[in-house]
Structure formats: C-alpha cells, structure tokens
Amino acid sequence: LLIIGIMVGYMSSSVVSLLNFFATEEGVKSYIIWGMGNFGGVSMEHIPMFMAIVSIGIFCSLLLMKPLNALLLGAQYAESLGFNTQRIRNYLLVVTGLLSAITTAFCGPIGFIGLAVPHIARLLLTTENHRLLLPSTILSGALIALLCNLICYLPGEGGIIPLNAVTPLIGAPVVIYVLMKSKG
C-alpha cells in the first residue's frame, strides 16, 4: 500500500510537471502562489460553493461524535454498542478527504493546521470527548489559520509572506511536543 501511494504521488507529480511545462507564465505563477498556501485566491463568488461544501462536511463530521467516542474505548467496545467500525472509518476518511480537498482546492496546501490544531484543542481542553473536541477544533483551526494569515501581512506593502512559511512556526512545535510526550 505504501508503494502504491508513492507511485500515485510520482504520477501526480508527473502530470503537474507536464501541465507546468505547457502552461503560460501567468498560469505557472498562479500555481506557485497557490502551492504556498494563500487565502487571497478565494473571491466572493467562490464563497457560496465553498461554504456549502464545508457546511455539509462539518455537519457530517458532527454526526461522527458518538461513534468516535465509542472508538476511543476500542473497536470491540464500539462494535458491542452496535457501531460498524469499518463503516465509521470509511465515512471518516470520506468526510476528512472532502474537507481537506475543498480547502486545498481554494487555498492551496496549508501545512500543519490539520495536524497541529486537534492536538492544541486536546491539550487546552484536557479531554478526549469529541462532543467538545470537534467544535473546538473547528473554531481553533479557523482562528489559528486567520492569525497565521494576519502574520503574513505584517511586513507591509508588497511584502506578503506565504502562509506555508508561517503555519510551521506554530504547528511544528506542537507536533514535536506531542511526539516527545508520547515517547516519554
């Protein structure tokens, strides 16, 4: 499975390289800016479609709170409560894939927000209960992403820092802390 993932990555990279080769100068510039993560590419005409898809994804993720809490106690426990754990996992993959895809499509790949924010919420709330974690993660993610975007504009006129240059400054220390804590 790992090798298949690597091969899909190589094929995708090849397609992107070909598209960049045949693209106009403006197209390549747009792609590079998108690749650095940028909220500036989202216009008001994109917002209704973006919000509709994100709202559906958030609603679907909120439906997963009870099954996720059951899974915290183990797959056998969740199955004894009547949950189909394989279906829950597949549903979770589809919902997170949808939310990640729509955000990446509009804003580019923004590193560390999705990786660090759930851990930040868990550390602040000191709970594993998804009834609290999911809403707080959604709000914390939006707040941290907007804070990082604000930091990007601090240099002043014409000096906008790419979003992916700021998010690792917050996300990487959190991930390192979580990894060190789990080892110790």
PLM-predicted stretches and their roles:
Residues 1-184:
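Alpha-helical transmembrane segments in inner-membrane proteins
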